[in-house]
């Protein structure tokens, strides 16, 4: 998708804020723990290449979702370890090896497919994924884990690490978290040959369960300055959001009593109202359910009226403003502030999703 540089809608990314957030977490965990930056999904909408280049010197490696994301980083000049968290199909192993990309092995069946297809695993670096209770990919049985580690070694692969992922580390109720932690500890202790690198800590675990860190943390949404729990748990120390979203008024008109606005004519003007048009819509990830939410114009909250269209939305203005007046959708303007979590609450979703849905049509400026 082509970024729309010739319209005034843009995302502003503060790379220094991201670096400072990483350092803040590092200051609150033991100094001997490794830090992996999670830059999947285009670094949660912030720009994977730009973010990775900026923080490469202060982290020990990177985590991505799939092989294409990993290759993008390698081609951009990133040299540190890149772990693909998802499953890469056997026929793509040679490509991963050629790019020195570390793969996740989540089942003995995957290894059997490699053997059946005569895939050369020699020199491949892998981490074993353990399903401690998330229910997605990963090994559940200790016997399978031991066989995997043994047979991968015999095949010439290098088993560098083993990891799991917590489902509820961002919740106040620790019951499920403790169950998973116990499962993973028992699994690790039962291995005949445990890999050197053991990691289970995501953003939430690094914030609220730092005492359970093994020897590495995977920093995701916290790196971008967002609370993984939304509003459920207070942050133990400050972090700063790295992304703001802004646009400009491209059209302003006065509508009179009874006039209707937008698809479905869902908004009806009462009295005389100034209505401004902003060039952002659901094709940009600013979804239709944002009707009734507010944005900031001239330091004041202005309601989104009518349905959000594919490319545009309309807002009610307290007075006539000129074309080109700044509109803040996420971020600070004057004394008003709209956070990504505010947007998420309006949509009844999580702040992660808000950022990841911001499409490539919106150019990122650093």
Curated annotation (Swiss-Prot):
It holds the Pfam family Ala_racemase_N. Substrate binds at residues 136, 310. Its cofactor is pyridoxal 5'-phosphate. It comes from the Bacteria. Pathway: Amino-acid biosynthesis; D-alanine biosynthesis; D-alanine from L-alanine: step 1/1. The modification N6-(pyridoxal phosphate)lysine is found at residue 40. GO terms for cellular component: cytosol. SUPFAM superfamilies: Alanine racemase C-terminal domain-like, PLP-binding barrel. Its EC number is 5.1.1.1. One of its GO terms (biological process) is peptidoglycan biosynthetic process. It catalyses: L-alanine = D-alanine. Keywords: Isomerase, Pyridoxal phosphate. GO terms for molecular function: alanine racemase activity; pyridoxal phosphate binding. The active site is at residues 40, 263. The keyword Isomerase applies. CDD domains: PLPDE_III_AR. Belongs to the alanine racemase family. HAMAP family: Ala_racemase (MF_01201). Catalyzes the interconversion of L-alanine and D-alanine. May also act on other amino acids. This is Alanine racemase. It comes from Streptococcus agalactiae serotype V (strain ATCC BAA-611 / 2603 V/R).
């Amino acid at each position: 998708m082509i970024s729309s540089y010739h319209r005034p809608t843009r995302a502003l990314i503060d790379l220094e804020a991201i670096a400072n957030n990483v350092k803040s977490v590092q200051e609150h965990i033991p100094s001997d723990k490794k830090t992996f930056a999670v830059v999947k999904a285009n670094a949660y909408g912030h720009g994977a290449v730009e973010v990775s280049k900026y923080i490469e010197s202060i982290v020990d490696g990177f985590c991505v979702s799939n092989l294409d994301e990993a290759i993008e980083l390698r081609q951009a000049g990133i040299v540190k370890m890149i772990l693909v968290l998802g499953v890469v199909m056997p026929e793509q192993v040679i490509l991963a090896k050629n790019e020195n990309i570390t793969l996740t092995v989540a089942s003995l069946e995957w290894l059997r497919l490699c053997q059946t297809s005569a895939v050369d695993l020699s020199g491949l670096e892998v981490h074993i994924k353990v399903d401690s209770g998330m229910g997605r990919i990963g090994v559940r049985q200790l016997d399978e884990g031991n066989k995997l580690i043994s047979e991968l070694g015999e095949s010439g692969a290098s088993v560098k690490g083993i990891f799991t992922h917590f489902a509820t580390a961002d919740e106040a109720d620790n019951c499920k978290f403790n169950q998973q932690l116990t499962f993973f500890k028992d699994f690790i202790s039962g291995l005949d040959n445990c890999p050197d690198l053991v990691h289970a800590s995501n953003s939430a675990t690094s914030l609220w369960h730092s005492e359970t860190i093994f020897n590495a943390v995977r920093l995701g949404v916290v790196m971008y300055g967002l609370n993984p729990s939304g509003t459920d748990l207070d942050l133990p120390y400050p972090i700063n959001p790295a992304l703001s979203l802004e646009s400009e008024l491209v059209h302003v008109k006065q509508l009179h009593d009874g006039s209707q606005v937008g698809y479905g004519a869902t908004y009806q003007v009462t009295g005389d109202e100034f209505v401004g048009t902003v060039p952002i819509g659901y094709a940009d990830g600013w979804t239709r359910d944002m009707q009734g939410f507010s944005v900031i114009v001239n330091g004041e909250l202005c309601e989104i009226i009518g349905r959000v269209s594919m490319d545009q939305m309309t807002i009610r203005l307290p007075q006539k403003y000129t074309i080109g007046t700044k509109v803040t959708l996420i971020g600070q303007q004057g004394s008003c502030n709209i956070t990504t979590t505010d947007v998420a609450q309006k949509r009844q979703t999580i702040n992660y999703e808000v950022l990841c849905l911001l499409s490539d049509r919106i150019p990122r400026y650093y």
